[in-house]
Amino acid sequence: DSLYQEYIHGKDVDSCVGDVADMRIEAQGKAEFLDMGVPDILDYEKMKNKLQVRICDKEWNTDRLADKVVTEHGDFAAYYAVNLEENGEGISSIPVTVSLMNEWGVSVEQIQADAMMADKNRGVQLVDMTQIVESMIFGGTPKNLLNEKLDMETVENPMFCLTNESKMNGASLLLQEDIRKQIGECLGSDFFVIPSSVHEVLILPDNGIFQVPELNAMVQEVNETQVERQEQLSDKVQFCDKKTAVMENAERREARLEKEKAAEKAEVKG
């Protein structure tokens, strides 16, 4: 009853499911999970390939993250889930709480590494948005461009989507440095990351056309008008350096560069 009351008063589903899992662990351990139809949940070796990284804006999700295994990545926080079942209709999952991690006897670092590997095994896709729209109208499958080296002068509308094959909870692929490096090599330039939803992010090459304030305004408008609250990822546009694959808040980066430029001018005058 108390969990139901918390849910109807705004507590997110992931937190409620995590609370149930914790109560099962504390109550009777494995026997309870047998009754739930997940007998192997306490066997980490059997669960590690089912792990998935979930990503969210850490400022927006303090309640969701409270009892979870969490790693921080700039503006984002990653938490982790065990996907008990994945099919065309959706995902049945249990969030990885601190209690569950302790039962497994593994570290946060181990969970993160195994979850990232499991995410790669689900397939990483970088797709031209124009091809996505065309496939929705005319059918067909958009080409995965991740391992390509594009001639950006021939790309009419340079906007790309990073997600996984199932297009569910694919935005977290953004956290993997080698994937960011592949994207930079594909585009041949630095790039912006638009946090469109928890399922995917949009990639825009830094070709001088896009301005950070305009991109931030676009994200905020799309969040308010087109994305369900529980599927919103963030309103903070990111910038990624092609050479280093380092990702940072685009607005803060511009402020930092302006400050450095002003300091250099002052030094020259001095």
Model feature map: region roles:
Residues 1-161:
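Charged, alpha-helical interface segments at or near domain boundaries
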